[in-house]
Swiss-Prot record:
UniProt protein name: Sodium-dependent phosphate transport protein 2A
Taxonomic lineage: Eukaryota, Metazoa, Chordata, Craniata, Vertebrata
Species this protein is from: Mus musculus
Keyword Glycoprotein: yes
Alphabetic keyword roster: Cell membrane, Disulfide bond, Glycoprotein, Ion transport, Membrane, Phosphoprotein, Sodium, Sodium transport, Symport, Transmembrane, Transmembrane helix, Transport
Cytoplasmic face of the membrane: 1-103, 164-165, 369-410, 486-511, 560-637
Residues bearing the modification Phosphothreonine: T506, T621
Protein family according to the UniProt entry: Belongs to the SLC34A transporter family.
Keyword Disulfide bond: yes
GO biological process entries: bone remodeling; calcium ion homeostasis; gene expression; inorganic diphosphate transport; phosphate ion homeostasis; response to sodium phosphate; sodium-dependent phosphate transport
Pfam families attached to this UniProt entry: Na_Pi_cotrans (PF02690)
Length: 637
């Protein structure tokens, strides 16, 4: 029988360690080859292990520290499949080419439906909560509080699922004199945070595979982390110094800015012919309620009568003004599904919400599957090229900024940062785009959506142009300031590290993604809003201890991972606390028991899944070909 080393084609390897020319006697142990080597040996196989336990052999003076390795079985699996496949015949090649050519228009069709479903989803949220959003904006006394204004911006943008809608309401209130520019800046910051919830929801659709879900959720939440970190720095700075207000005021005063054309509707030209057959909204009702026009309180958001030539002529004015201006023209009923149903806005909104979510999820799942099949043999080469396609050596640093330009340009074309970031989220999950590349693309997307707002502000009347343009510039300079804070130096790119940590946590506990959405975009903003309503004394009394505790925990976590020797021994880990205070494992057990309490247990196959985490590995049995001594605490295969 051939020995293991002879099957490798190399010299025999002693089962005992050798120091110099002398063999060290002691317990035998095996030298573990890499997965790539094992795949070349007939009759052997490897399992993907996300992390390896530390191996310490003190009796042989071979101490090994902690090892953290991540073996992705995809490269070797693809290589094996390519080697084992027979050479296809000409007819098979033609069939494969025809199938791939057929998948391209299908992918474009699913992408079109995906974008349309996002538009309908935004309309559904506006029908369900649009008037509530207008009422929130109406209370100017609340919005004068910067923290309350920030929370209002988050909640309203989450409600209407469109930062463009919330920003247009803010611009209308500022231009009408109901809201000062300084009070509107925190709301702009909040709308920047609220718009990132869409791609986070899209990432949930890839929860079936832990590795893909980890990458997709990290790529989606890097936008959230950037926005939250920017707000934590720039909101106190703005409240103390008025930085954005003064800078944008100087820019507006320095240039002779004149009104221009509306922002181009490049994407809506393609999507509106389909979405207008489903629903048409009169968004001026929300704006009118926000500016205090109670005459439209009982009007429906669903558009009934349309002008045959300019169906959107009344979007920038109230319904009463629109009817007055079009009194001498012919009006006709709008052509969409809900024009004659007589259903209330809330019912129509819930119907559209359910339908658009079903279409969105279906299109996304089919897009991911088709991308997988098209890129199956090229995913790894794409992943390698995505990390190596930098500019030549002296200009390597320009690559990220070029990605920002690409992200800004694409967002300007589609006129929606949510659409762009939601479109690249599945690619991040598949590994085609790395999170290091997705980060500058997302930052460029933030810039692209602000340029659209600037062009829209230039279409304002001359007497209202200054204030509306200043608000649009505040949005622009907020994102520019965030980029200067969190991108130029590699050590300052904290959003990437935070997003990766969230991705790992979510891949291990998939319910954590839903908890993250509820806490960050609903519960935490609502709690802060309620405390801010009690006055600044309550905010200081509650916020100061909480902020100090959060800063202490972050500092200790950094020292525990980087320099534990500088901490007292009892503080080098969190084990002195109850387990539920520093681990999600107890909560995960409760959720698992709650969800599976009525499920009938079924026998499971002993075969391991293709990708498993160390916490999920069953007790390992020694391999018959690589037998390890039972009394050694060696690495499990």
């Amino acid at each position: 029988m051939m020995s293991y080393s002879e099957r490798l084609g190399g010299p025999a390897v002693s089962p005992l360690p050798v120091r110099g020319r002398h063999m060290v006697h002691g317990a035998t142990f095996a030298y573990v080859p890499s997965p790539q080597v094992l795949h070349r040996i007939p009759g052997t196989s490897t399992y993907a292990i996300s992390s390896l336990s530390p191996v310490t052999l003190t009796e042989h003076s071979c101490p090994c520290g902690e090892v953290l390795e991540c073996h992705d079985p995809l490269p070797t699996k693809l290589a094996q499949e390519e080697e084992q496949k027979p050479e296809p015949r000409l007819s098979q090649k033609l069939a494969q080419v025809g199938t791939k050519l057929l998948k391209v228009p299908l992918m474009l069709a699913f992408l079109y439906l995906f974008v349309c479903s996002l538009d309908v989803l935004s309309s559904a949220f506006q029908l369900a909560g649009g008037k509530v959003a207008g009422d929130i904006f109406k209370d100017n006394a609340i919005l004068s509080n910067p923290v309350a204004g920030l929370v209002v911006g988050i909640l309203v943008t989450v409600l209407v699922q469109s930062s463009s809608t919330s920003t247009s309401i803010i611009v209308s209130m500022v231009s009408s004199g109901l809201l000062e520019v300084s009070s509107a800046i925190p709301i702009i910051m909040g709308s920047n945070i609220g718009t990132s919830v869409t791609n986070t929801i899209v990432a949930l659709m890839q929860a079936g595979d832990r590795t893909d879900f980890r990458r997709a959720f990290a790529g989606a939440t890097v936008h959230d982390c950037f926005n939250w970190l920017s707000v934590l720095v720039l909101l106190p700075l703005e409240a103390a110094t008025g930085y954005l207000h003064h800078v944008t005021g100087l820019v507006v005063a320095s240039f002779n800015i004149r009104g221009g054309r509306d922002a181009p509707d490049l994407l809506k030209v393609i999507t509106e012919p389909f979405t207008r057959l489903i629903i048409q909204l009169d968004k001026s009702v929300i704006t009118s309620i926000a500016v205090g026009d109670e005459s439209l309180r009982n009007h429906s958001l669903i558009r009934i009568w349309c002008h045959p030539d300019t169906t959107e002529a009344s979007t920038s004015m109230s319904r009463v003004e629109a009817i007055g201006s079009l009194a001498n023209t012919t009006m006709e009923k709008c052509n969409h599904i809900f024009v004659d149903t007589g259903l209330p806005d809330l019912a129509v909104g819930l119907i559209l919400l359910a339908g658009s979510l079903v279409v969105l999820c279906t299109c996304l799942i089919l897009l991911v599957k088709m991308l997988n099949s098209l890129l199956k043999g090229q995913v790894m080469s794409s992943r390698r090229s995505s990390t190596q396609t930098d500019f030549p050596a002296p200009f390597t640093w320009v690559t990220g900024y070029f990605a920002m330009v690409v992200g800004a340009s694409m967002t300007f074309v589609v006129q929606s940062s949510s659409v762009f970031t939601s479109a690249i989220t599945p690619l991040i999950g598949l590994g085609v785009i790395s999170i290091e590349r997705a980060y500058p693309l997302t930052l460029g997307s933030n810039i692209g959506t602000t340029t659209t707002a600037i062009l829209a502000a230039l279409a304002s009347p001359r007497e209202k142009l200054s204030s509306s343009f200043q608000i649009a510039l505040c949005h622009f300079f907020f994102n520019i300031s965030g980029i200067l804070l969190w991108y130029p130096l590699p050590c300052t790119r904290l959003p990437i590290r935070m997003a990766k940590a969230l991705g790992k946590r979510t891949a291990k506990y998939r319910w954590f993604a839903v908890l993250y959405l509820l806490v960050c975009f609903l519960l935490l903003p609502s709690l802060v809003f309620g405390i801010s309503m009690a006055g600044w004394q309550a905010m200081v009394g509650v916020g100061t201890p909480f902020g100090a505790l959060l800063a202490f925990v972050v500092l200790v976590n950094v020292l525990q991972s980087r320099s534990p020797g500088h901490l007292p021994k009892w503080l080098q880990t969190w084990d002195f606390l109850p387990r539920w205070m520093h681990s999600l494992q107890p909560l995960d057990g409760l959720i698992t028991r709650a969800t599976l309490c009525y499920a009938r247990p079924e026998p499971r196959s002993p075969q391991l899944p293709p990708r498993v985490f160390l916490e999920e590995l069953p007790p390992a049995t020694p391999s018959p070909r690589l037998a390890l001594p039972a009394h050694h605490n060696a690495t499990r295969l």
